[in-house]
Amino acid sequence: MAVARKIRTLLTVNILVFVGIVLFSVYCRLQGRSQELVRIVSGDRRVRSRHAKVGTLGDREAILQRLDHLEEVVYNQLNGLAKPIGLVEGPGGLGQGGLAATLRDDGQEAEGKYEEYGYNAQLSDRISLDRSIPDYRPRKCRQMSYAQDLPQVSVVFIFVNEALSVILRSVHSVVNHTPSQLLKEVILVDDNSDNVELKFNLDQYVNKRYPGLVKIVRNSRREGLIRARLQGWKAATAPVVGFFDAHVEFNTGWAEPALSRIREDRRRIVLPAIDNIKYSTFEVQQYANAAHGYNWGLRCMYIIPPQDWLDRGDESAPIRTPAMIGCSFVVDREYFGDIGLLDPGMEVYGGENVELGMRVWQCGGSMEVLPCSRVAHIERTRKPYNNDIDYYAKRNALRAAEVWMDDFKSHVYMAWNIPMSNPGVDFGDVSERLALRQRLKCRSFKWYLENVYPEMRVYNNTLTYGEVRNSKASAYCLDQGAEDGDRAILYPCHGMSSQLVRYSADGLLQLGPLGSTAFLPDSKCLVDDGTGRMPTLKKCEDVARPTQRLWDFTQSGPIVSRATGRCLEVEMSKDANFGLRLVVQRCSGQKWMIRNWIKHARH
C-alpha cells in the first residue's frame, strides 16, 4: 500500500509539473496574462494541503521540493504584474529579513512622500512585496501544534490614501503566511481615498494576482476607521474576522494560535502581539511582550503584563489585557455582532478600541494579547483624518464614559479638563448603547477596575478640578510649569492638562495631568514648607511633613496652607513671566476660583 501510494503521489506531481510547463509555453506564445497560471498556483496550494499527510517524512519533503519548483516557474511569470506599476515581487531585494534599507537617491521626492504618508513610501516601492521578516515568536511557540479543523478567517484591511506598495505588501504577507485552507478571503476597505493609483492599479493587480481571494469594498464617502471596519465586517463571510491596518506584515504562524484560542472560546477577542516597522527604513524591530492599557483620557498605551503572567515565566502564554491598541484584532464574527460591534456613533477613530475592551470584559467576554501570533506594524509620523482628530478622540472618550464607566466617568472629564455639565462636546445619543448594556446584563465599571485593570489610579476623593484663576489676574491660570521643574507658575489660560488642578477631600492641591496608572507618575502636590515665599511642586509621597501639602480652599475664597496659615497669592514682579509671580504670604484677601465642582459618590 505504501509503495502504491508513493507511486500515485509522484505520478500526480509529475503530471502537475508537465501541465505547468505546457501552460508556461502557451503563456510565452500568447504573451498574455494567462488565468490558467493563476489557477495552477491555486491548485498548487490545494495539492499541498491535500497531500500534507501522505507518505513518510521523506516522501513529503520530496513532494514539497517538486511543488516548490513548479510554484517558482509559475510565480516568475506572475511577478510581471508588479513591474508595470513600479513595484517589486518575489525573493531578494532591499529590506529582506526585515533589515533596514536606504536609497541613494533619497531626496526631495522622498521628503514629499514622508509628508503625504507618514513613512518612506519611496523606499517602500523598492522593497519586495514578498520580503521575509524575522520570526520573533517565543521559542516555545514554534514547537506548538494545532487542531486540523480550525475555523477560517476573513482578513479585513482598512485604508485611506495609503501607499499602494504598503497595501499590497500587507496583502502578500497575509497570503504568504496564512495556510490556504484557513484564509477564506482578504477584504480591502477603501475609505474614499483620493489617490488615483488606489483605484485602477489596485483593482487590476489584485484581480489578476489573487482572483476570487481579494475583495475591494469602496466607501462612497469618508466614514472614518470605525465605520469602515463595520463595512468590512458586513462583507466578511468566514466564521472569524481579523481587522488590521493596511500597513502591516505578518509573521509566520500568526493565524493558527489566534484561531485556536477563539475556537476554544468564541467570546475571546485575540490581539496578535505587535512588532514595529520603522517608518524611515522599514526595519522590523521586536517589541517586548506587553498588555494594552489606557489613561483616563482613554488614550491607549502599552503597559506591563499582569503580575500573574510575569510570575508564570512562560513568554508564549496569552496576556490578559484591559483594552487594545487597535491596529489588529481577531474575533468570532457572530460574537462580534452579538456584543454590538464597534460603536457606530463614534467618529473617525480614537477611543473605540478602549470602549471595546471595557464592553467585552464587562459583558462576559475576554481580551488577550497572544505572543505566538505576531504582526509588524508601521507607526506612522502622520496619520489620515488628522484634522480635528483630538476633538474626535475627546468626543468618543466621553461617549464611552457615559455608557460604560458609571460614576468613574468624572475621571474622563477631569483628564480632558472639561466640565461634566455643558462640556462643549456633542457626543451624540447614547440611548441605544445604554440599552445594549442592559440587554447584555453587563457588570459595573468598578468590577472591571478591580478584576481587569487594577493598575488604574482612582481619584474618587476629588471635590473640584479644572482651571484655577485669581481675582487679581483672571486671564491667567495656575500651571504646573516645566514638567521636570518644581515651580508652579501663572500662565495665560488655555485649558490643557498642564493647567488641570485638582482639590481633594483630603486637602491636596495637585497640578498637572492625571497619573492614571501605576506605570505613570502622578500629578505633583503644591507645597508650602515654610522656608521661603515661593510654593513648590513635589511628588506627594516625598513631602517631609504631610501638613505641608494640605490646603483649605473654598470657591471665591483664599487658598490657605494648613501647615503655615499663609495664603497662596499673586504679586506683581518685573522679573517674573507676564509680570506675575506666585507667592505664599500673609493673607491679603485675594480670591481664587476653580472651574468645576463635582459631587463624588464613595465606592
UniProtKB/Swiss-Prot annotation:
Required co-factors: Mn(2+)
Region (Catalytic subdomain A): 150-261
Listed GO CC annotations: Golgi apparatus; Golgi membrane
Membrane topology classification: Single-pass type II membrane protein
Regions crossing the membrane: 7-29
Presence of keyword Disulfide bond: yes
Membrane topology, Lumenal segments: 30-603
Ranges of the Cytoplasmic topological domain: 1-6
Gene Ontology biological-process entries: O-glycan processing; protein O-linked glycosylation
Record field: catalytic activity: L-seryl-[protein] + UDP-N-acetyl-alpha-D-galactosamine = a 3-O-[N-acetyl-alpha-D-galactosaminyl]-L-seryl-[protein] + UDP + H(+); L-threonyl-[protein] + UDP-N-acetyl-alpha-D-galactosamine = a 3-O-[N-acetyl-alpha-D-galactosaminyl]-L-threonyl-[protein] + UDP + H(+)
EC number: 2.4.1.41
Glycosylation sites: N460
Family per similarity comment: Belongs to the glycosyltransferase 2 family. GalNAc-T subfamily.
Protein name: Polypeptide N-acetylgalactosaminyltransferase 9
Organism: Homo sapiens
